[in-house]
C-alpha cells in the first residue's frame, strides 16, 4: 500500500511533485519523501505508460 496522495504500480509507489527541480535537487528531494525513495527509472513499457499518464494527469490539474 502507498501513502495517501501516492499512486501504486506493480508494488511500487509513485508521486508527481511540483515545481520542477534540477536532477540533483530532485533526487535529494525524492530520497527525503519516503524510505527507499528515488527518481523514477523506467524499466518496462507498462511502467512507462503508467508514469506518462501520471504526469499528464498532474499537469492537467495545473
Curated annotation (Swiss-Prot):
Protein's UniProt keywords contain Transmembrane: no
Main location group: secreted
Keywords: Disulfide bond, Hemostasis impairing toxin, Platelet aggregation activating toxin, Secreted, Toxin
Tissues/organs with expression: Expressed by the venom gland.
Disulphide bond pairs: 2-13
Localization terms from the record: Secreted
Xref: Gene3D superfamilies: Mannose-Binding Protein A, subunit A (3.10.100.10)
A GO term from the CC aspect: extracellular region
Domain C-type lectin: 9-62
PROSITE patterns: C_TYPE_LECTIN_2 (PS50041)
SUPFAM superfamilies, per database record: C-type lectin-like
Gene Ontology molecular functions: toxin activity
Top-level lineage group: Eukaryota
InterPro entries for this protein: C-type_lectin-like (IPR001304), C-type_lectin-like/link_sf (IPR016186), C-type_lectin/snaclec_domain (IPR050111), CTDL_fold (IPR016187)
Subunit annotation: Heterodimer; disulfide-linked.
Biological function: Snaclec that binds to von Willebrand factor (VWF) and induces its interaction with GPIbalpha (GP1BA) (via the vWF A1 domain), resulting in platelet aggregation. Intravenous injection in mice induces a dose-dependent drop in platelet count (thrombocytopenia). Pretreatment by intravenous injection by this protein in mice potentiates the hemorrhagic lesion in the skin provoked by the metalloproteinase BaP1 intradermally injected. This result is not observed when both BaP1 and this protein are injected simultaneously.
Similarity field: Belongs to the snaclec family.
Name of this chain's protein: Snaclec aspercetin subunit alpha
Organism: Bothrops asper
Amino acid at each position: 500500500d502507498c501513502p495517501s496522495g501516492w499512486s501504486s504500480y506493480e508494488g511500487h509507489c509513485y508521486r508527481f511533485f511540483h515545481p520542477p527541480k534540477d536532477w540533483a535537487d530532485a533526487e535529494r528531494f525524492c530520497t527525503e519523501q519516503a524510505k527507499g525513495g528515488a527518481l523514477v527509472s523506467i524499466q518496462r513499457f507498462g511502467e512507462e505508460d503508467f508514469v506518462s499518464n501520471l504526469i499528464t494527469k498532474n499537469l492537467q490539474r495545473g
